[in-house]
């Protein structure tokens, strides 16, 4: 089947799949680790020129990221073994205060608190 459709096979490490999923999460999707494998493979094939910029590609997400909350939280808390989390968005604990939340947001985006 693979040969009939001129297909290729690629692999992804735990770090590659975790970072690929987190990278795509920043676009508004919330990917599961399995989809992270497909995304990581896609990125590697693009980098090698196997998939060209003009090519059309479909990546099918196999599950929602909410089914893998331990993986997601572990990534952003930098707790996954053997993974350098390039796109981690570390949780920030704040008091129950509108002003504290507002200040944290403004500080994060590099503007003065209003």
Model regions: which residues?
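Active-site-adjacent helical/loop segments in soluble small-molecule enzymes
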Residues: 1-52
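Phosphate-binding loop/pocket of nucleotide- and phosphate-handling active sites
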Residues: 40-114
């Amino acid at each position: 089947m693979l040969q009939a459709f001129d297909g290729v096979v690629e692999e992804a490490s735990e770090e590659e799949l975790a970072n690929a999923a987190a990278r795509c999460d920043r676009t508004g999707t919330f990917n599961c680790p399995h989809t992270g494998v497909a995304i990581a493979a896609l990125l590697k094939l693009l980098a090698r020129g196997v998939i060209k910029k003009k090519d059309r590609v479909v990546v099918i997400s196999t599950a929602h990221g909410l089914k893998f909350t331990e993986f997601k939280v572990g990534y952003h808390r930098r707790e996954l073994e053997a993974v350098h989390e390039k796109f981690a968005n570390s949780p920030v604990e704040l008091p129950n205060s509108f002003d504290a939340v507002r200040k944290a947001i403004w500080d994060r985006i590099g503007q003065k608190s209003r």
